């Protein structure tokens, strides 16, 4: 009713899709959600109602609300098979578009592939074009479940190349990509990767000269591989003191074991602990570089990298950019209380 009233009053057309979130209360009350969705679809056949969930009571098993949301976002994709473009790759599953300078986009451009991302879409028609890709690629762990499901449903190729700070893992992922594209010239790829690694080493060494032995803290909101970043920095001589995280990702178990042996004094702190609310009141006695918002808030540091979820960083280029961001953060003071409280991009409500 409100949708129709808005259309009559403002002339604003009905949305093509609505992300409808149900919460814990609906489950407690035993709501017949399927009937609700069925009724909505009958009343508004021109609108796709996407089944989204904000039900943390269900997080003990099965996909998380975040994983289910990233799956729901692509359920309307059901393109005409005649339009499938084998030279198009859709990179999906993350909240951020990858940098133009990232490894994936550079390699795909060399191979003559067209890249599409959700963040580039400004119309429904552009969104639908995402489904015409011959291959779906995901880099973000929480997006893997949804994008793999999408690829299976549309019977397309799927590649999971997770974000990483490990040279050998990145090398393996990019060889996998290169081979899947059927591009000749492995020597070209090898030489290209060596140049990228050299740029990483140069950036890390320069950052070390600037940051010196200043203590560094990292948190899991900065990147899905916080322990991998800690290992990379420790190997390059940085003074990493603490990693804030609430669990060890299966993708980081090998790194965790390495840190236990090679960095036994490294602290791992849970962010869900009640005392973390006031930990920032004990300001650091020395200049501390915080990598991530929770690390900045928890340490009270005014020198922090203000970035979440790995953002647009990927591959060897992502390592280089991380070193540059660390250097920039260490040289420029920011107030965490005025920056970190800003959450979300904002979204138009259908009601």
Task: Give a label for each model feature.
Residues 1-351:
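An N-terminal assembly and electron-transfer interface module characteristic of large anaerobic redox
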